């Protein structure tokens, strides 16, 4: 899957703030959405997710919602152990 659009909510409580709470940036998440290494489904929410390395080498999961075939809305992202 290739996302043409990634929607970020910069308002208080939005997905930008939530990602930053996990010491990640929107650039980290965008990079992994474009260069993921594995896909899956979140066991807690049932949402789709992708796994991959950030440019600085951290292995993260990005949980997102697909609003259409071209658009992803990141819900959360955080560092995880490599498989």
Short names for language-model regions:
Residues 1-83:
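Ribonuclease/tRNase effector modules and their secretory precursors
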């Amino acid at each position: 899957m290739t996302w043409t659009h990634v929607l970020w909510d910069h308002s208080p409580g939005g997905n930008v703030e939530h990602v930053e709470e996990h010491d990640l940036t929107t650039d980290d998440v965008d990079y992994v959405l474009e260069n993921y290494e594995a896909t899956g489904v979140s066991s807690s929410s049932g949402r789709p997710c992708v796994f991959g390395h950030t440019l600085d080498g951290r292995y993260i999961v990005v949980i997102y919602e697909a609003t259409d075939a071209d658009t992803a809305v990141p819900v959360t992202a955080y560092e995880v152990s490599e498989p």
